[in-house]
Amino acid sequence: WYENSIQNDDVNQNLVKEFLLECRKEYKETGNKKIIEMYSEVRSFINASNYCLSPNRIMSLVGKYSNTSYSIAEILEWYENVNLLSEENYLCPVCGKLLDNDILKEFRCTDMCMYYRDKESLLPKKFNVDNSGSKYKKLKRGIYTYTLLPGVSELRIYDQLAGCYGYEKVLLYPEIDKFDISVIFDTGVIYIDVKDFASPHDLVETLIKNQSFIKMESVRDNDYVYLVIPEHRQNTYKGGNYRNIVKKRILQLTNKVRVVSEDELHKEVGDIVNELY
């Protein structure tokens, strides 16, 4: 059972990768900038508010871009039917997942979710089912695990930066996911990748395996590249200073990438902005 579940998770996550590749291919062939807009909106749609939802919400997004790309229909495969046996359900306030209301589990969720719930004293959210016989969908587990959960930190950092510098200058998943976030100014661009790995060693090895440094070093000389360690990883890792472990290893591989914690990122971006202006 376990092996089959893991295989299904991998298959589900590949659905997102296939969508990414289709969007890149279509954009390369057509140059239609609506595809870039579509990809960013679809990726940001996979968030805590849309873990469990009505099919109408999904169809609304599909309809918005149905004349832009045939690949938009693929997101229908990212969700599966869910049977809500109770009219009153509870969702995790961090990731949006349906919580088991077994009193012994105390509505617990992932370690990341519990970190932010404890820090901010967040309580589970009530999710009431209407009596109209409406059906609901939930995100498939592989997409929840490999896209929604890492996206929690990406979206949080994006919203914070956009709140400071404006949504017209701060882009989410720019250039069809070349990076997670970019901050654009007259004389340069700050590119940001947020990496949410349990182990700093696994993070670096994955970057090497995926040849991510080629992408990071391909930016212009007056651009900046930041690799950001989410707050919960930096503060809960027990094997040493997470950021320093990654930083030391990456310095052996490239001098283009700056490794910072989430807290440090905002000062770094602010310093660069002040220099540019």
Report residues per predicted region:
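Active-site beta-strand-loop-beta-strand hairpin of nuclease catalytic cores
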Residues: 179-191, 217-218
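Exposed, interaction-prone assembly regions rather than primary DNA-binding/catalytic cores
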Residues: 5, 160, 180-181
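Beta-rich nucleic-acid/ligand-interaction surfaces
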Residues: 73, 172-184
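Acidic-basic catalytic patches of nuclease active cores, encompassing PD-(D/E)XK
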Residues: 85, 125-173
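Nuclease-adjacent, charged terminal/linker segments that flank catalytic cores
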Residues: 1-129
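Non-catalytic C-terminal interaction segments of nucleic acid-processing enzymes
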Residues: 47-51, 63-84, 243-277
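Catalytic cores of nucleic-acid endonucleases
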Residues: 195-254
